[in-house]
Amino acid sequence: MKPATHRDKGEQAEQLACHYLQARGLRLTQRNYHCRLGEIDLIMEDRESLVFIEVRYRRKGRFGDAIDSITPAKQARLIAAAQHYLQRTGGAQNKPCRFDVVGITSEKGADNIMWLRDAFRVES
């Protein structure tokens, strides 16, 4: 059996995050939305809000926590991709939107999930 690749681990982390959020009442709208401006891992609905979610995975102790890896440049790409999604879908019926981050760290085979709601905002 070949070892898991970086992409495999990312997909596993996204699946874990999706199940975690669904267990907390969010409904999946789309996974892995791609456009030329960037990618959004998960797009979900939380009551009346549309939620754009970035999932980050890190092994404990390597380069800080998963959530710390969301740089301003990454935030800008997520915002641009979300704007593209909203334009393409007609503004998603003018629902309020937010950006969440799910950080998953693994230590000694155990996963720790941290959900940061409203992790950053769009500056107007």
Curated annotation (Swiss-Prot):
It comes from the Bacteria. Signal peptide: none annotated. Disulfide bonds: none annotated. GO terms for molecular function: nucleic acid binding. InterPro entries: Restrct_endonuc-II-like, tRNA_endonuc-like_dom_sf, UPF0102_YraN-like. Pfam families: UPF0102. PANTHER family: UPF0102 PROTEIN YRAN. HAMAP family: UPF0102 (MF_00048). This is UPF0102 protein Noc_0355. It comes from Nitrosococcus oceani (strain ATCC 19707 / BCRC 17464 / JCM 30415 / NCIMB 11848 / C-107).
